[in-house]
Every structure is written in C-alpha cells, then in structure tokens.
A protein has these predicted regions:
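Conserved C-terminal "switch" segment of AAA+ ATPases
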Residues: 204, 223-224, 237-302, 316-319, ...
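N-terminal accessory segments that target, anchor, or regulate ATP-driven/P-loop NTPase machines
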Residues: 1-50, 409-412
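Soluble catalytic regions of large protease machineries
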Residues: 327-329, 336-499
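Active-site alpha-helix of zinc metalloproteases
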Residues: 99, 165, 323-328, 336
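Short pre-active-site segment immediately N-terminal to the catalytic Zn-binding motif
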Residues: 313-328, 370
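Short, structured interface segments
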Residues: 32-44, 298-311
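Active-site phosphate-binding and catalytic loops of NTP-dependent enzymes
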Residues: 85-92, 203-208, 315-321, 344-350, ...
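Walker A/P-loop NTP-binding motif of AAA+ ATPase domains
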Residues: 55-268, 385, 400
Length: 499
C-alpha cells in the first residue's frame, strides 16, 4: 500500500512542478539512473523479503499415507517421540532433537516424510529449497536463513502451536563443505548462519523448531552440519523393495477402478528400481491410457504400457525405415535368446515399437530383489548386453550405433568387476589403479564374454531369422509367444494386446 501512495505522490508532485514551468528532464534522468543502480547493485535482492513455502495440507499427511518406507518411518517416529513427550525426555536429561537428515535417491518420499513428521508432532510446516538461499550478493543467504527461522516461529504462534518444522530440500546446495567455493564466500556465510540458528534452538523457547534436511549426496555436506547437536539423526530413505512397491501401488490405485485380472504383486515384481514417484506416475499413466481407450476399468495391458512409458518415455512419431526395423528386430531377438538361456521364462515383452530414444527393447521379468551380485551374474549380464550387437553382426555382417547404450552399460559392469577383484588383476585400489591397466582389464573381460556369445548365437542364426521375421510382422511379442517360436512351435497363441 505504501508503495502505491509513494508513486501517487511522486506523480502529483511532477505534474505540479510541470505546471509551475520547472524543467523536469534532470529529475527524470536522475530517477532513471537511480533505478538502474538499484537493480544492478543488488540492493533490490537484499531488500526483497524471503518467504518459505507454507503448506496448509501438511497436517493432513500422516505416516499411514506413505508406503514402502517402514524402516525410515520407524526411525523418524522414534526420534519424534522426544519432541512429543519432551517432559519425560527432560527428566532423563535427553538433549532436545534439533535436526533430522533424510538421505536417499530422488522420488523416495523424503518431502512426504517431513510433512508427516510435522503432522505427528502437531507442528507448523514450512519448506524451502537449498538453492533459494544462495545469491551472487554477499549476505543474502544468511539474511534468508534468519528470515526463514523467524517466519517459522511466527507461523507457529499464529496457529497457537508449540512446535514448528522447517524442511530444507537439496540441503547440500547450502550445506556443502566450506572452502570449496573459491572466490565465493556467500556459500560459507549461508552455512555459518544455518549452524548459528540451529545452535540457538533451545528447549526453553516458546516455539520448538525441528529442522529436517533432505539430500541424495551426504558426502558433499560439511562435517560441522553433521555433528551431534545439529543433525542428530541421519535416516536412509532408500528405493522400496518389492513389498514396499506393492504397498505404494495399493495406495496409488485405491481410488482407481481395477480390472479383476490386474495383479499388483506382478506389477511390483516388474518394477524393480522404481521409486515411489515412479510408481505414482505408473498408476496415473495407466489411468490415462484407460481413459483414452474409453475403458471403465484399468486393465493389465494399461499397466504394461505404462511401465514401458515410465521406463523409456513416449512412443516416437517418426517411424524407422524397413531396413532399420529388420536390424532392430534381429538386435532385440539376440538379447531375448541369451536372456532365455540364462533364465528361462525371463522375457516379458519384445517390441520394435520406437519409444523414447530406443528403436526397440526387450523387457524382462526381474528376479527377486537382490543387492549383491556374483561374478557369474555379472558375466551373464554382460553376455545379454553384448548379444544384440553380435546378432546384428551374424546376420548383416556389421554392427550399428543401436548397440552403443548396451556397450556403455557393459563397460560400466566390467569396471565394477575389476574394482570388486573379479578380474585377472586381483584385488585393486580403484583410486591408484593406472588407467591403462583398467582399460586392458575391462577389454579382456568384454572380449571373453563376446567370444562366448558369438559361439552361442552362431548355432542359432536360423532361429534369430525366423523369430525376428515374426516380430517384424507383429511389432510386439509377449514372452510366451516368443518361447513358442524359439522352440519351433508355429501354432499361434492368442495375441496379447497391449494398450
């Protein structure tokens, strides 16, 4: 309001002076220069107030609304009990909890956990991103940290609450190790102010503040931020396992009409490596596909199509040439043959429908969730990755760039084998291993597996030719139909129609 009054008074004054015959040009030039200086000097940024994002719906989110993170939820609830029952904690001489750090990959529900924590303690909730605090002008970040804590206290008092929760996403942006940003002390000043504010949190305050940070790079954080008395709890929020994925799918499909044939357990098995955000997107995409098809329920085909879309992206509008499609079909059948030899029944779908950056792909039914890999498992994975290019070479006497992503992944796995002591170099130190020795070890591993795959597929050239011809005609082959064709059974199965 004061801004509008000032502008009105200035305009009225200028009109009055103009009527009195005063030359206004010098005043206009001076005003323009002052405005330009104000914007370029950073004064505008310094004077601009900072406001965190207040979430009125935070109190509506509970831990029961979050699936797939049972261990993380249990650890957070245990920590929050010190705040809920602060009097009992004080009697035992327990230091008040000031900060909780949630560490884990993107999309695993760290923000939801923070909101549920606020609801659990009956606290006001305010959120900010680490990138909002750092500017090119010195002092801005520290000023915004002070404003954030002040806003949290005022918000709690406004709603007659004794607790406030501040959530800082991507906290590694402002909490990175000091001294790494040469020539830019703004980062260090911002972090110092955050440390000061957290040290100033007292159990005797009218409003008790809990700071919850989220990051996927704990290794980048300054040690001072992680010491006891600041972030007292570091809780890992990992990708959900199969049971966790099933819980998340049940939550996100609770408001959607599912066809009786939809098996959520099967979908959970096929989505190894999916985060909670991926699974929410999967359920939403399946509903969109059902809507487009005019269906009243979500069918298995909608979920199959949605899995492909989440993993690989939208279908491409541009259609490859017939020559390219033949090569893609041979490439994918090469993958499929080796996959079926390694683990019979592993192929779910093979298709030459372009999607995302892939001209075709083979989707497997994942094994049980595993977090350790043996040498044999890694070698078999290398064989599967190499098989597409070898199939192309056997039928077309040349390779294509379509295998480049396979080779990148194969090289990564071969390096993993070297660093795990699975090469002829034995146990090595990854940091001191010369690059030329690493390159030779990786090359030997890949050459050995390539020779094994070539020997295997040379005896299956006719199978590749026959099955790829069927794939060209149908564009998609379900795993059961593929296995019939490999076995030489040409009796057609009932087609599996994917949305």
């Amino acid at each position: 309001m004061s801004k509008e009054i000032t502008i009105g008074v200035a305009i009225a004054t200028m009109i009055f002076l103009a009527l009195q015959g005063v030359n206004l040009l010098p005043f206009l030039l001076l005003g323009a220069l002052s405005y330009l200086f104000y914007n370029l000097s950073g004064l505008k940024v310094l004077n601009k107030g900072f406001q965190g994002q207040v979430s009125p719906r935070a109190r509506e989110i509970t831990f029961a609304d979050i699936g797939g993170q049972e261990k993380a939820k249990q650890e957070i609830i245990e920590a929050l009990e010190f705040i809920k029952d602060s009097s009992a904690a004080e009697q035992l001489g327990i230091r008040p909890l000031k900060g909780i750090l949630l560490a884990g990959p993107p999309g695993t529900g760290k923000t939801l956990l923070a909101k549920a924590a606020a609801a659990y303690t009956g606290a006001s909730f305010i959120a900010a991103a680490g990138s909002e605090f750092v500017e090119m002008y010195a002092g801005v970040g520290a000023q915004r940290i002070r404003a954030l804590f002040k806003q949290a206290r005022e918000l709690a008092k406004q709603h007659n609450r004794k607790n406030a929760t501040i959530f800082i996403d991507e906290i590694d942006v402002l909490g990175g190790k000091r001294g790494q940003h040469s020539g830019h002390l703004e980062y260090d000043q911002t972090l110092n102010q955050l440390l000061v504010e957290m040290d100033g949190i007292s159990p005797n305050d009218d409003v008790r503040i809990l700071v919850i940070g989220a990051t996927n790079r704990v290794d980048l954080l300054d040690e001072a931020l992680l010491r006891p008395g600041r972030f007292d709890r570091i809780i890992q929020v990992e990708l959900p396992d199969r049971e966790g994925r099933l819980q998340i799918l049940k939550i996100h499909t609770a408001n959607k009409p599912l066809d009786p044939e939809v098996n959520l357990e099967s979908i959970a098995s096929q989505t190894f490596g999916f985060s909670g955000a991926h699974l929410e997107s999967l359920a939403n995409e399946a509903a969109i596909l059902a809507f487009r098809a005019g269906e009243k329920t979500l069918k298995p085909g909608h979920f199959n199509e949605a899995i492909d879309k989440v993993m690989l992206g939208e279908k491409m509008d541009r259609q490859p040439s017939e020559k390219e499609l033949k090569r893609v079909a041979v490439h994918e059948i090469g993958h499929a043959l080796v996959s079926e030899r390694i683990r019979p029944g592993s192929v779910s779908i093979v298709t030459i429908v372009p999607r995302g950056s892939a001209l075709g792909y083979m989707r497997e039914v994942p094994e049980d969730d595993s977090y350790l890999q043996t040498r044999r498992q890694l070698e078999e994975r290398l064989q599967l990755l190499i098989a597409g290019a070898i199939a192309e070479e056997l039928l077309f006497h040349s390779r294509s760039t379509g295998a480049s992503s396979d080779f990148i992944e194969a090289a990564r796995l071969a390096k993993k084998m070297v660093f795990a002591g699975m090469s002829d170099l034995g146990i090595v130190d990854p940091e001191s291993l010369p690059r030329h020795l690493l390159h030779r070890a990786v090359a030997r591993i890949l050459q050995t597996q390539e020779a094994l795959v070539r020997k295997e597929l040379q005896d299956k050239v006719e199978i590749i030719r026959r099955v790829s011809k069927e794939l060209l005609q149908e564009e998609k082959l379900a795993g059961e139909r593929l296995r019939q064709l490999i076995a030489g059974e040409d009796k057609p199965l009932e087609r599996v129609h994917l949305a």
